[in-house]
Amino acid sequence: GPFLVQSLKRDSDSFWSGDAFAVIFDPVNERTNGAIFGVNSEGVQTEALITGEPARRGGQLSGYNKAWDNKWYTEASVSENGWTAEMMIPFKSLRFGKKDHWGINFIRIDANNNANHSWAPVPIQFYGTDLGYLGQLIWDKPPKNTKKNISFVPYLLGDAYKDFENQSNLNQSFDIGMDAKIAINSNLNLDLTVNPDFSQVDVDEQQTNLTTVNLRFPERRLFFLENSDIFSNFGTNAKPFFSRKIGLDDDGNTIPIIYGARLSGNLNKNLRIGLMNTQTQEQELPGNNYSSLALHQRVLKRSVLRGYFHNRVGFSEGSIKGDDFNRIGGLEFNYSSVDSKWRAMAGYGLAFSNENQDQNHIFNLLGGYGGRAFNVMVNISGLGDNYINDFSLIPRQKHYDAVQDTTYILGFNHWWATMGYKFYPENTFINQHGFSLTTNGDRTTTSNELIQDKHALSYKILMKNTSTLDLTYAHEGVNLLYPFRFTDDDTPLPA
């Protein structure tokens, strides 16, 4: 010691910046999905689903779902010689079959020496959580599944109030509902909800938005969490599915859900399925029925062929509104080499409604290489002017005109590319240093007008004492296509 602890909050964003120990499980042993459980020297826990290749883009860490929570137990103690941790993880929190080989790895973060260690070696250019480099846990006998893994959580809420000043009558209200989770088998799970109560869900972290782009908050509602990557892991910049579009309006206010059913998991070792249906309540606006189907078929060693179909249909006065619908479909191929160095993606999708039948496409292309020293990645994506997706929150698609009080939907093409080179000197105070060049931007599909762009050249030195020297030259521009104001009281900025 002393040992570094950045936060005592569970699942903190700064958890991995301090001393920590973690174990990774891949019970299916296909190197495409896993779960990580971590603890620091003060016994603070974190856990997450690993839903892809861990990476950073735009300062955001991707490939993890930290909203996934399970009940497990840890104890940690600090002594003169170091610190120790004891972990007890109930296997009922994992989905596994009768396989006697699991993927596993152990990670140790030594913050004082700015070093990460893993039991199964991982090349230095990758995160220690990369599933392509897991070791093997071999069971003499595979662990037994719990015969009955069913949880049922009913609730009853009531309130009463009276205005004594105005001598009003006593007003009372009651609400009842339930949530259920049923393990169909060791790899397939059924979630059910009736009139769900999401009042226990963590509130969104308040953020100030001074941009023209809507903020994207993480999903925290339990019903939508398990195996959420089956539905959401499509695309890069423009993703065709975002579960917070169901049961929440654009301002985060609740739209009551009448019921929901969700089947997700592995049908076999190579095929994952997600099937969901939910119904929202009719209020001032018609209710909606949302249906989603997503399939992930593993091909080659670590590659995945994926497809999705989403359907929204309006309901009013107990009947379907035939002219109020939105249907989304698409296919995607995601290639990853066994050693994780090469990666490629290609996807195409269409959106249908009763009004728009052309310029309703979305596409995504990505390719790159990540070696020990040299890395390069290029991503090009785009969508048409009539790609209207009620299941998605796509940045820079909607543009608000503060003068006309009108929102315009525009198709755009997006590019993002990065290239870098790292050096690993053998001396006493530098871990690594290197440069990177990054560019990204968006232009409208029809008129090729610039929406935004950013170009940056960076040189970074990482010291062994955890210090960092970062020299960056960046040029960033935003083109207002329509007048914009930060608040309702501001004078709009001209386009």
Which role does the model predict for each range below?
Residues G1-R298, R306-G307:
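Structural preference for beta-rich elements and adjacent junctions enriched in aromatics
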Residues A20-A22, T84-E86, S151-Y155, G177-M178, ...:
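Membrane-embedded beta-strand positions in outer-membrane beta-barrel channels/transporters
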Residues S41, F91, R108-D110, G158-K162, ...:
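Transmembrane beta-strands of outer-membrane beta-barrel pores
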Residues I50-G52, H117-W119, F164-N169, D204-Q207, ...:
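Outer-membrane beta-barrel translocator domains and adjoining extracellular loop/strand segments
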Residues E86, G103, S151-Y155, N189-T193, ...:
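Residue-level detector of the transmembrane beta-barrel scaffold of outer-membrane proteins
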Residues L94-D100, P142-I150, N187, N270, ...:
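Short loop/turn motifs that connect adjacent beta-strands in outer-membrane beta-barrel proteins
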Residues P256-I258, S264, D339, R343-A495:
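Exposed, low-structure sequence patches enriched in small/polar residues
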Residues E282-L365, G384:
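Beta-propeller domains
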